[in-house]
């Protein structure tokens, strides 16, 4: 759950991205902030709430991610699930409002999820 940018909760990692950020900034934030905390936590089950409104074609989040960025982060999470959770991972789909970009992003996510 969202608990604010400055949350001190141990189970929340908020890494705000500036409007207009692209996949490079997204990947850097994931690699430097989010994945180390996920690895340290070593979950026994991973739940993904996959939203795609950060796609560059979607005007909802003002970010510039592309399909490949969603596939990449999905692979990262799946790797962690293999390491700590015996592959136990569940994904649910959420937002994304530009339908063509949503379809491509969901396809990239599912392909990465299935390996």
Where are these regions (language model features)?
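Short active-site-adjacent structural elements
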Residues: 55-58, 88, 98-102
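A short helix->loop->beta-strand "cap" motif at the edges of active sites that frequently abuts
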Residues: 81-88
